């Protein structure tokens, strides 16, 4: 017995998520252009998508960070410390570049609403006071109220505590993390429909001005990533190896960044990076640890995304930011970026944590996340390419520096 073919279902299963998002974006634009009244009604789909993101984000941050810390292995004898330092310096430098670019070229977003009961911080002292109170919040209340700083604090604390637990307990945490990540992936699969509703309603209400705002935001994001890839990272590598870094930089971008751009997953690109390290003749005991570690914590692209989108929301809402607070944002964005690995849309879902520094409500922060999904077609690909290629770049730089030091001894 033969069953009739279902070309629509076949097309959906064969088309990538990026392709589906592009279709949803174009369909939303067309609907808003020709049937604005209908476009306003389908905005409900976008609201459902944003609500789903709001529901999953707190649990995601809590479980992911706790499981990651609990399952960290101790006692590995490798030259990992210099590479770890490069990862942290690179991520923080990327956040600083994003802060400078956001001040030099401020972006404005078209948000559905500007809540009137906002209480933006007056300066660094007030921010630190609010930060401390958020850290010591009740964990249940932190999850319910989406207090991401409190969630992060409890996740780190419990993760450290569970490092001394039995293997069974740590495996359970790892499986729990995988389960939550699967739920996130299911939510992200509905991104094309959510983007369709968001784009249709946004452009029906705001017209071409919203598109201009997104274009400017995308230019700032990609400009920061290109600057980090071709200026900041080569400078860091030069200080480490004391020779022309660009042959190595271009090799990593070509061999690792190209595949990462299309897979949009640092975890999926780990085999590619391991093979590239082998071809470069690097120390196997080092890169076998540093590459998976880099896929977890080396997140310069994510730091840029979190910083630029957060400051875009701050600029849109008219919140004044002083220099110390901007520096604190760079630190927070770097820490947030380390928790964005291996998760679909991870860097976008951590934006509310950074937004909370400025008293921005979760409702507004998740609208910013939705904007991020609209531009994610290019943003996420470029972010992953920067993150993954830098894993090999910094590993190669550290290995070469160690070899030079050993030969000089």
From Swiss-Prot:
Keyword Cell membrane assigned to the entry: answer is yes
Q: Which residues fall in a coiled-coil region? A: none
The UniProt catalytic activity note for this protein reads: L-serine(in) + Na(+)(in) = L-serine(out) + Na(+)(out); L-threonine(in) + Na(+)(in) = L-threonine(out) + Na(+)(out)
Q: Which GO terms describe its cellular component?
A: plasma membrane
Please explain the role this protein plays, according to its UniProt record.
Answer: Involved in the import of serine and threonine into the cell, with the concomitant import of sodium (symport system).
Species, as recorded:
Pseudomonas aeruginosa (strain LESB58)
Any idea which GO molecular function terms this record carries? neutral L-amino acid:sodium symporter activity
Q: What SUPFAM superfamilies does this protein's entry cite?
A: Proton glutamate symport protein (SSF118215)
Q: Where in or outside the cell?
A: Cell inner membrane
- Sorted alphabetically, which keywords does the UniProt record give? Amino-acid transport, Cell inner membrane, Cell membrane, Membrane, Symport, Transmembrane, Transmembrane helix, Transport
Q: Which domain of life is it from?
A: Bacteria
Keyword Cell inner membrane in the entry? The reply is yes
Bilayer topology term: Multi-pass membrane protein
List, in alphabetical order, the GO biological process terms annotated in this UniProt record: serine transport; threonine transport
InterPro entries, per the entry: Na-dicarboxylate_symporter, Na:dicarbo_symporter_sf, Ser_Thr_transp_SstT
Listed Pfam families: SDF (PF00375)
- Where is the major localization of this protein? membrane
This protein's name: Serine/threonine transporter SstT
Family (UniProt): Belongs to the dicarboxylate/amino acid:cation symporter (DAACS) (TC 2.A.23) family.
Q: Where are the transmembrane segments?
A: 17-37, 49-69, 83-103, 142-162, 180-200, 218-238, 301-321, 331-351, 357-377
Report the gene name.
Answer: sstT
